[in-house]
C-alpha cells in the first residue's frame, strides 16, 4: 500500500565495486556518528578518492574536519588535483583499513576480552587510540 501511494521507494543495492568503477570519480562522504562506514572503506580499499569527515580514521583517503563544508570543498579540490598522480594512495589506505580487520591482532585480543567480560557480566569501558592502535580501559 505504501509503495502504491508513493510514500516509500525501493531501490536496488548496487555493489560498491560496480558503483565506484562505473559511476564515480570521487566519493564525498559526510557522516555523523558513523565513523567506520564500510562504503568509504570499500572505496578507499579499491583506490577511489574518498573525501570524508570520519574522525576515527583521518588518515584514510582525504579528510576534512567535522562539518566544515568550505574545508571539505578545498579537500575535494586537493583530491581532484593530487589523486591521479598519488602512487602510494592505495597502499596507504589498505594499511589504514587493516587496523580494523583480522590483521590487527591487538584489536582481536581486545574484542575477545570484551566479549569474555560481557559473557561474565563484567563491564569495562575502553578507549581506542587510532594513532598507535592501542586499546585501554577508561
Name what the model sees in each region.
Residues 11-14, 57, 136-137:
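Repeat-unit-sized solenoid/scaffold elements
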Residues 22-102:
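Catalytic binding pocket for nucleotide-activated donors in carbohydrate/polymer assembly enzymes
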Residues 18, 70, 105-109:
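Generic alpha-helical secondary structure signal
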Residues 83-137:
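A charged, aromatic-enriched C-terminal amphipathic alpha-helix characteristic of glycosyltransferases
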Residues 16-17, 40-41, 112:
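Short amphipathic alpha-helical segments and helix-helix/interface helices
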Residues 1-14, 18-19:
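Nucleotide-activated donor-binding/catalytic signature segment of Leloir-type glycosyltransferases, i.e.
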Residues 15, 25, 53, 108-109:
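Alpha-helix initiation/capping motif
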Amino acid at each position: 500500500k505504501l509503495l502504491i501511494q508513493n510514500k516509500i521507494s525501493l531501490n536496488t543495492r548496487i555493489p560498491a565495486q560496480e558503483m565506484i568503477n562505473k559511476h564515480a570519480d570521487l566519493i564525498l562522504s559526510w557522516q555523523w556518528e558513523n565513523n567506520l562506514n564500510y562504503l568509504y572503506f570499500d572505496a578507499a580499499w579499491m583506490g577511489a578518492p574518498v573525501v570524508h569527515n570520519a574522525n576515527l580514521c583521518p588518515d584514510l583517503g582525504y579528510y576534512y574536519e567535522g562539518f566544515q563544508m568550505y574545508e571539505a570543498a578545498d579537500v575535494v579540490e586537493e583530491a581532484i588535483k593530487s589523486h591521479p598522480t598519488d602512487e602510494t594512495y592505495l597502499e596507504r589506505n589498505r594499511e589504514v583499513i587493516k587496523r580494523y580487520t583480522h590483521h590487527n591482532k591487538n584489536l582481536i585480543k581486545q574484542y575477545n576480552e570484551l566479549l569474555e567480560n560481557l559473557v561474565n557480566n563484567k563491564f569495562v569501558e575502553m578507549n581506542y587510540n587510532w594513532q598507535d592502535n592501542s586499546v585501554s580501559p577508561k
